[in-house]
Amino acid sequence: PAAGMNPQEREELMAFIRSLQRKGFTILMIEHDMNLVMNVSERIYVMDYGKVIASGTPEEVVADPEVIRAYLGESEEET
């Protein structure tokens, strides 16, 4: 939902999503803006080529070795 939004609009979107969460709504969001995802999500599913490679809290998925390998690559020492 944040594609093409400026920083102010993204902040307003995050505030709106949080207001819905406080009211008890569950939100399914497909998004590539990781700042937005990490700031509003309680649980994240990470996909790579259509396959779920990790799920968990934001802290868990950013530390997951599969996520790091898929999105940041491996160092030369690991290959």
Placement of each model-derived feature along the sequence:
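Glycine-rich phosphate-binding loops of nucleotide-dependent enzymes
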Residues: P1-T79
